[in-house]
């Protein structure tokens, strides 16, 4: 009887071992894999007070300015320390994004309109937003044939304005731009919060694993559908 009890006790202990090993091999914490979760965790974007992210809502120019300042620490750049205030008629000092708008203007990352207008509430299309994002990140000085090779991978790249092609090539090369199921960039569509979350999540990933700067390693289009 004593031998039987000992055997049963040993079997019970052995059954516990896999659970213990499994618990020990689980990572203490895992980085969020969803783009929205990533950018919220990084405090680059926030959900609304009701807890919704509203990924299909359009990004405004003021929101883009605020996101860029936080992401690329534009306020730490030497040009942001200029003492003179840039006159912007439609952005009073009481505006929630006043400081960020001053920063993107002083650093030259974003431009005003008609001299002294910013249009902070105006939505911005994907070509503009991704090009500006690439400017803040740093545009690769690809030769024209490399730019053409990158853009040729996307069926609707002909819709990208000429002024944005080099910046868009950087954004696409770095994987910042999501595409629809056909691989289209949709450069003239409004930039959404979901699009921006995707770009930011890829930027965060690039901090850990930079893209190879080799022409033969040009990436395929990102396959995440556009929000």
Give the location of each predicted region:
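Intrinsically disordered, low-complexity, charge-dense segments enriched in Lys/Arg
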Residues: 169-171
């Amino acid at each position: 009887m004593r031998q039987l009890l000992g055997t049963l006790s040993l079997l019970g202990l052995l059954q516990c071992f896999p659970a213990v090993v499994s618990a020990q091999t689980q990572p203490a914490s895992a980085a969020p894999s969803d783009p929205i979760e990533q950018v919220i965790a990084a405090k680059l974007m926030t959900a609304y007070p009701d807890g919704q992210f509203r990924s299909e809502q359009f990004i405004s120019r003021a929101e883009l300015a605020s996101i860029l300042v936080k992401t690329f620490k534009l306020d730490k750049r030497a040009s942001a320390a200029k003492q003179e205030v840039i006159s912007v008629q439609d952005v009073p000092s009481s505006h929630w994004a006043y400081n960020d708008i001053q920063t993107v203007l002083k650093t030259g990352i974003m431009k005003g309109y008609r001299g002294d207008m910013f249009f902070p509430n105006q939505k911005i299309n994907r070509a503009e937003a991704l090009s500006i994002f690439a400017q803040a990140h740093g545009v690769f000085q690809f030769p024209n044939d490399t730019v053409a090779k990158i853009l040729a991978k996307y069926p609707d790249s002909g819709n990208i304005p000429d002024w944005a092609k080099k910046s868009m090539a950087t954004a696409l090369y770095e994987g910042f731009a999501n595409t629809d199921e056909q691989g289209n960039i949709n450069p003239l569509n409004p930039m959404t919060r979901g699009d921006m979350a995707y770009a930011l999540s890829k930027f965060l990933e690039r901090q850990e694993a930079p893209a190879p700067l080799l022409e033969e390693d040009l990436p395929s289009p990102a396959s995440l559908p556009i929000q």
